[in-house]
From Swiss-Prot:
Ranges for region G5: 174-176
Cystine pairs: none
Gene that produces this protein: tuf1
Enzyme class, spelled out: hydrolase
Entry-linked InterPro entries: EF-Tu_GTP-bd, EF-Tu_GTPase, EFTu-like_2, EFTU_2, G_TR_CS, P-loop_NTPase, Small_GTP-bd, T_Tr_GTP-bd_dom
Chain spans, region G2: 60-64
Protein name: Elongation factor Tu
Enzyme Commission identifier(s): 3.6.5.3
Length: 394
């Protein structure tokens, strides 16, 4: 039989498994792959392939992640699974694999454990919008009341972190049972797939958002004006539209008088494209790398924010020594480094390489930012940490 062509006709959604070590995240990932490929076709990935996750580098940090893909009735999914707890933290903070929703795996035999809580908290901090629960290992618990109790505990824990614990789907199943071909447990995997389709809304595509393009370079073209270049992060820019230049200095307004790509003139620049935008009335020295070009009023400059941060260990090429309050590294946002001072939380005296924690940063210059924006922490061009803006303060 000839290979089927990959059809881009279904909406695409990114998901991943989270939860405590040994609760069955990778087994569930393998079970989803096995059951859904049986129903909808595609390539099956087995446990060993998923568990043997390749190394990837994201913002100078090495992370092990496994990617699988599968289809449901309504959608195409890309699913990430990480082998180690540290990989999860790094993955979520760097946004290496951004999730539109997560499947929280909780073993019915254990109930919620420390990493269960930690992954829920991280999901809240880094902006994972939806969580679905898969209660695993239900085949070895024969006490109905115990299952109910565990489900109640998980729901309460999710509510504690502002997820709708009472309303979100909880599926009781057995990943191993499904992998072994037991029809009753396979049906629970199909139920999980239906929950993904119905509970996680279709994500807004980058092209539908308000226009924003981080500025990488600025040129002046005699007789035509100033051109800024960069990759459009989201939205569309059309000739004649008003734009703002935000960050580092006071916000300036301008109008787009031309868009070009590979030296060709275009009517518009779209999300994902590298292009040059010609700006009316601005001189070359008015604009610099590190600012962003955006739709008026869509993003504001800020200097103070709370962040969730992972500090690289010595083995990862990070610092060899801890840092203390008053630490002033550079924070690399999109295209530029800005110096900032770190304010450690109450009771934290020092931060060791390999730690992850929450701290407040005050930058010396404002940066265009929204909650959920990722950054790297650098010292003289070397990455020593990664973070995400969890709350804007000023």
């Amino acid at each position: 039989m000839a290979k089927e062509k990959f059809e881009r006709n279904k909406p695409h959604v990114n998901v991943g498994t989270i939860g405590h070590v040994d609760h069955g995240k990778t087994t569930l990932t393998a079970a989803i792959s096995a059951v859904l490929t049986k129903v909808h076709g595609g390539e099956v990935k087995d446990f060993a392939q998923i568990d043997n996750a390749p190394e990837e580098r994201e913002r100078g940090i090495t992370i092990n992640t496994s990617h699988i893909e599968y289809d449901t009735e309504a959608r195409h999914y890309a699913h990430v699974d990480c082998p180690g707890h540290a990989d999860y933290i790094k993955n979520m903070i760097t946004g290496a694999a951004q999730m539109d929703g997560a499947i929280l795996v909780v073993a019915a035999t254990d109930g919620p454990m420390p990493q269960t809580r930690e992954h829920i908290l991280l999901s809240r901090q880094v902006g994972v919008p939806f969580i679905i629960v898969f209660m695993n290992k239900c085949d070895v618990v024969d006490d109905e009341e115990l299952l109910e109790l565990v489900e109640m505990e998980v729901r309460e824990l999710l509510s504690e972190y502002d997820f709708p614990g009472d309303d979100l789907p909880v599926i009781q199943g057995s990943a191993l049972g499904a992998l072994q071909g037991d029809e009753a447990w396979e049906a629970k995997i199909i139920e999980l797939a239906d929950a993904l389709d119905t509970y996680i809304p279709e994500p807004e595509r980058a092209i539908d958002g308000a226009f924003i393009m981080p500025i990488e370079d600025v040129f002046s073209i005699s007789g035509r004006g100033t051109v800024v270049t960069g990759r459009v992060e989201r939205g569309i820019i059309k000739i004649g539209e008003e734009v703002e230049v935000v960050g580092i200095r006071d916000t300036q307004k301008s109008t787009c008088t031309g868009v070009e790509m590979f030296r060709k003139l275009l009517d518009e620049g779209r999300a994902g494209e590298n292009c040059g935008v010609l700006l009316r009335g601005l001189k070359r020295e008015d604009v610099e790398r590190g600012q962003v070009l955006c739709a008026p009023g869509s993003i504001l400059p800020h200097t103070k924010f709370e962040s969730e941060v992972y500090v690289l260990s010595k083995d990862e090429g990070g610092r060899h020594t801890p840092f203390f309050k008053g630490y002033r590294p550079q924070f690399y946002f999109r295209t530029t480094d800005i110096t900032g001072a770190v304010e450690l939380p109450e009771g934290v005296e020092m931060v060791m390489p390999g730690d992850n924690l929450k701290f407040v940063v005050e930058l010396i210059n404002p940066v265009a930012m929204d909650e959920g924006l990722r950054f790297a922490i650098r010292e003289g061009g070397r990455t020593v940490g990664a973070g995400v803006v969890s709350k804007i303060m000023a």
